[in-house]
A protein has these predicted regions:
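Internal mixed-charge
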Residues: 1-5, 9-10, 95-163
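Hydrophobic/aromatic-lined pockets within catalytic cores
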Residues: 15-23, 44, 48, 52, ...
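An acidic- and aromatic-residue-enriched active-site/binding cleft used to recognize and process polar
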Residues: 20, 28, 58-62, 126
Length: 163
C-alpha cells in the first residue's frame, strides 16, 4: 500500500506532470490549490467507480428502513454513505457464502428497493489515500493530471495527452 500518500502529495504529483508549481495545502491561496481542491474528491471517486477494485470492496448487510417505498416494492434499504456509486457491485438476499447474485431490486437515489427482507451488498467505498496500492495511486495521479491540465495550464493539448 502507498502508506505515505496524501491528497496533497497525489495532487502535487499531478501538478508536477503538468509542469506546474506544487502546493503546500489545498487552502494555500494559490490558483493551483483552489483548482485541485475543487477537483480532487470528484476525480478520486470517479476513478474508484471505474472498476470493482479488490482493495476498495466492502461487503455489508443493509438495514431495512422503517418507511415503505412508494412504488411496487415492499421494502427499502439505505445504501452505505461511504459508497462511491449508488450502483452496488453485487446484491444478495442471503448472507451465506456462495449465495446467488440477485437481480430483483431497483435503486432510487440512495435507496435500494426490493421485496426481500434481507439485503447484503458488495460495493466500492471511498478508500483513504494511505490504503491505496501504488498502481492505483499512479492511475489517480494520471486522472488528476488530465482533469487539472486545462484549468492549470490553459492548454487543451496537455489535457488530451493525459486523457
Amino acid at each position: 500500500m502507498a502508506a505515505g500518500d496524501t491528497k496533497v502529495t497525489i495532487a502535487n504529483n499531478a501538478l508536477t506532470l503538468l509542469g506546474a508549481n506544487t502546493i503546500t495545502s489545498f487552502t494555500d491561496g494559490s490558483k493551483a490549490a483552489g483548482i485541485a481542491n475543487n477537483m480532487y474528491d470528484f476525480v478520486k471517486k470517479h476513478t474508484l467507480s471505474m472498476y470493482p477494485w479488490k482493495f476498495a470492496l466492502k461487503k455489508q448487510e443493509l438495514q431495512k428502513d422503517t418507511a415503505t417505498p412508494v412504488n411496487e416494492w415492499d421494502n427499502q434499504f439505505t445504501l452505505p454513505s461511504d459508497a462511491v456509486s449508488t450502483l452496488p457491485v453485487a446484491v444478495f438476499f442471503s448472507g451465506q457464502s456462495n449465495a446467488p447474485k440477485e437481480l430483483n431490486f431497483e435503486i432510487y437515489e440512495n435507496k435500494l428497493v426490493t421485496n426481500s427482507t434481507e439485503v447484503y451488498i458488495d460495493y466500492v467505498y471511498d478508500v483513504a489515500e494511505g490504503n491505496m496500492p501504488t498502481y492505483f495511486v499512479t492511475l489517480l495521479v494520471y486522472q488528476l493530471a488530465w482533469h487539472l491540465a486545462e484549468p492549470i495550464t490553459d492548454q487543451t493539448t496537455k489535457s488530451d495527452y493525459w486523457k
